């Protein structure tokens, strides 16, 4: 996912001042949207999912914006259990994701990221050749 996002051609890379969101199924990016507002970007993906009857159960969601409670709630409404952001996670976003049983990753850059909730979904003995995960305890 992170490698796909790093290679993604984007307005942000060319001009800045926009947020990007993507929907993934495994390692495959299904949709990528950029907008000046992170809420607009996630709403575009939610609308696409609704229009095409796409279930979020086996999907993951990536955003360049902060993971606030609003972003976590929108992902939950989409049925997406795993959320990844290259930025940070707010306390309310973290608490809501934990209550909803979602997996929340923040500060995802290169091959390193923080797992705030839902670490039990992943191998506790990561392959040293793969991404490094640090679990954050509440």
Question: What residue spans do the PLM features occupy?
Answer:
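Conserved catalytic-core subdomain
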Residues: 72-138
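Conserved mixed alpha/beta catalytic, RNA-binding, or beta-rich assembly cores of soluble enzyme
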Residues: 1-66, 71-73
């Amino acid at each position: 996912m992170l490698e796909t996002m790093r290679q993604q051609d984007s307005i942000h890379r060319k001009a800045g001042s926009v947020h990007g969101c993507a929907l993934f199924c495994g390692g495959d990016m299904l949709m990528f949207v950029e907008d000046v507002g992170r809420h607009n970007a996630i709403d575009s993906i939610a609308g696409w999912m609704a229009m095409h009857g796409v279930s979020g159960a086996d999907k993951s969601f990536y955003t360049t914006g902060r993971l606030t409670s609003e972003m976590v709630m929108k992902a939950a409404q989409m049925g997406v259990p795993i959320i990844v952001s290259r930025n940070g996670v707010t306390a309310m976003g973290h608490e809501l994701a934990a209550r909803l049983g979602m997996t929340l990753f923040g500060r995802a850059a290169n091959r390193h990221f923080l797992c705030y909730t839902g670490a039990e979904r992943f191998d506790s003995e990561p392959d040293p050749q793969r991404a490094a995960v640090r679990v954050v305890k509440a």
